[in-house]
């Protein structure tokens, strides 16, 4: 049985796949009981949710630290706590600081969402950072994820955040900037321009909160932005010098 905290878009996606193999108890701060049942899970109190063998944290990272403080005294002493945040260094730090030492910790980042994985998980990537978890338990989880068609990538929180600062945070930064610029479909276009517009499609369904959080809580995101903006200014200087 799994306890799931946070019934947002990703929480619903997780239920759609995990409910095929597990009974899932869901706690959400708002009254979503009917929607939770319709999704295939059981609405529950925070206490019941935290008593499960595995607890999956699906809230925004901005709410994670306070949530950890609430659930710490409620967890099963041998529970496995899994987060799905798009950054890893700070969530791991908070889980280590705030949760009992007997609790196992697995930091994850599913590299997909409700739009890209609506029909299948086959070929989708998931990053795992095994922070405090018995080897046999970790291997069992890896085998289960691979059986669902997922490609498992094992790395450290710091390495994950360095790479995701470019592949996710910077991509969303460019996408939001293109939107602010007013980029749109044009009759006279190029394949390169179409690929730029695809970035808009990637970010348009994500919230501003997610955008802000992936930059605010990733210790490497600001540096990636600075380097990118510096490179753009250098290109502008180059053009000014030769035009």
Annotate each PLM feature.
Residues 74-94:
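ADP-ribose/adenylate-binding Rossmann-like module
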Residues 58-60, 85, 130:
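Glycine-rich, N-terminal phosphate-binding loop of Rossmann-like dinucleotide-binding domains
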Residues 46-75:
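Rossmann-like NAD(P)-binding element
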Residues 154-243:
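An accessory alpha-helical subdomain
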Residues 1-45:
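NAD(P)+-binding Rossmann beta1-loop-alpha1 motif at the extreme N-terminus of oxidoreductases
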Residues 87, 91, 95-151:
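Rossmann-fold dinucleotide-binding core
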Residues 42-47, 153-157:
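Short acidic-hydrophobic, aromatic-tinged amphipathic segments that line or gate anion-handling sites
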